[in-house]
Amino acid sequence: MKKIYWQLLPLLLFSVQLIARNTDSAWIRINQLGYTPNGVKVAVYGSKGSMSIPQFSLIDSATGKKLLVRSAGKAMGAYGPFNQTHRLDFSSFTKPGTYYLQAGKARSPYFRIGKDVYNGAADFCLRYMRQQRSGFNPFLKDSCHMYDGYTLYGPMPDSTFVPVTGGWHDASDYLQYSTTSANATAHLLMAYRDFPSVFKDTYAANGLPGNNGIADVLDEAKWGLDWLLKMHPKDDWMFNQIADDRDHSGMRIPKLDSQYGRGYERPVYFITGEPQVRGRFMNNTTGTSSTAGKFAGAFAIASGIYRNIDKDYSELMQYKAGSAWRFALRKPGVTQTASVKSPYIYAEDNWVDDMEFAAATLQRKEDALRYAAQEPVTPWLGEDTAKHYQWYPFINLGHYELARMLKGEEKKNVISYYHTGIRKVWEKANRNAFYRAIPYIWCSNNLTASFAIQCYWYRQLTGDKQFSALEQANFDWLFGCNPWGTSMVYGLPVHGDTPVDPHAAFTHIMKAPIDGGLVDGPVYGSIYNNLIGIQLFNPDQYAPFQSQLAVYHDDYGDYSTNEPTMDGTASLVYLLAAFQWSAGK
């Protein structure tokens, strides 16, 4: 027996060495866009082994010289695929240049520090918005969905034609929702209003290359506004969506969309304030407020912006804002979307936030304060889960618009609502190295971008920087400081690790890029394992970084994590504009 043991010992030792070598695999995750000289600069070290590291180095990429050696700080423990993690904080280093980090045998990709690292990123994401246009599509240089659409649920006879061509396709399908489109339009308008110097004019209003004296972001916002006008053509008419989940029967280019048995016409659903079809069930619509409130807010902001650009359009926007406000009051409650084949819908459950947003932008201070008090904190903040788009638009835009018009104690009180929500997230986030406490539900990246905006707004309104590291961590997550080490935006940065095989017809059928599209992002392993119709078409290059906690695939077959969305991208446009503007101050 002893003889056999000694014969096996070298093999056993070799096996132990192999195990150690495998479990000691480690990576450093960074924001691939880079960092600003005076901003928070943190990378995350993640290891398959359990040993902590004492320090890390910042190294000049050109000379190989160590310019900074810092303590790796306390070990943060296991997270997702990693057994040990550290936050590598190099915020004190401010010299512009190109660098990499080294910690043990782990080495980060190159990254830049500079005031200009975010320049042009917001405009880059507008490429995806233009590509999502319905009607004339400038990317295709062709038209689609010119026969929208025939009515359902309206006061007019079913199948009445209404001209509603325009707007944006919601995602890689070609559905068009008023709720997401109004929210996207509002974000683009606010981005122009708050950071006008960030945006360039290199495209015409129709989305083709050229210029027209108008910033491209405002051209894109107006594309959304003009469609919202079609969806609210009369004071007592408002439509909720074009098309439904019959769209999901297969990928195709937009102009070949004929899924509804009526040639190229698509259904247009009227907002009734009553439940409508949801697969074999009915949705939980209770009123008209959530979608109409978003319309009112977008129109009101547009009225202010266009006052010195196009007076007639400004007056039209002001009138429509009031009209949408009144429509929202017809039956206080939430408007959910409709589906025919499956139960998957945008199951929005809150509406007072939308009414606060509408009231604040319409300068209805007392109404806005009343609605704000009814839902001071967006309900998902600090929670582990939520239904798909249950608390939309993920943060309360109304608090920001209201705080901008208030003073004194009223202003402090509204700002405290943001503080409370951020604190709920922070109490969970500070337990892991990624400062991650966003639920891994569908469109987790959209929640991430929105939460980063809330942190930014809180900092701007107060000057309080206590949550700056949390804000930056959520921003960094979207560009590679995550377990997978990938940016979640197609093509950004240009030479980075970004999605290349998204769930999108343009890339899958046409082999065309979808520059600037923010993909849905990781989901809980439990969600991924229970979704219908997911099948990976290629080996998983991120297999070492998958876990039961969260899954992400850069694979056409994974519609749950790798499908870009129009509204998430519009939110990201605002966030990127904010970061570029802040870096240049």
Positions of the model-derived regions?
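Bacterial Sec-dependent N-terminal signal peptides
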Residues: 1-23
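Short, compositionally biased P/S/T/A/G/V-rich stretches that sit at domain boundaries
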Residues: 21-33
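Aromatic (Trp/Tyr) and acidic
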Residues: 32-109, 115, 130-186, 191, ...
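Short, glycine/acidic-rich hinge or "gate" loops at secondary-structure transitions
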Residues: 199-207, 237-241, 312-314
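Acidic, glycine-anchored loop motifs typical of Ca2+
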Residues: 206-214
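Carboxylate/His-rich catalytic cores and anion/metal-binding grooves
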Residues: 217-242
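Active-site-adjacent structural elements in folded domains
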Residues: 278-283, 338-346, 381-386, 433-441, ...
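Aromatic-lined, polymer-binding surfaces characteristic
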Residues: 292, 296-306, 314-366, 375, ...
